[in-house]
């Protein structure tokens, strides 16, 4: 088990933790559909990334009432 060699003061501990804060990513507007998306990620709404379709969107399937 790790044991500290010297006591770390509250000031030094807090100064070390000053860089640990999480920053929320700024959402960008999709160039294809205009929805907000995460930077450098595929758009969840249309499946485009860098002006090309990466994920093909499935069309909605209509079910007959008799089949259900």
From Swiss-Prot:
Name a biological process GO annotation.
translation
From what superkingdom does this record's organism come?
A: Bacteria
Q: Which GO terms describe its molecular function?
A: structural constituent of ribosome
Read off the InterPro entries from this record.
Ribosomal_bL32 (IPR002677), Ribosomal_bL32_bact (IPR044957), Ribosomal_zn-bd (IPR011332)
- Keywords from the UniProt entry: Ribonucleoprotein, Ribosomal protein
**Keyword Repeat, does the record have it?**
no
* Matches recorded under HAMAP family: Ribosomal_bL32
What is the protein name stated in its UniProt record? Large ribosomal subunit protein bL32
The root-end lineage is: Bacteria, Pseudomonadati, Pseudomonadota, Alphaproteobacteria, Rhodobacterales
Q: Which gene encodes it?
A: rpmF
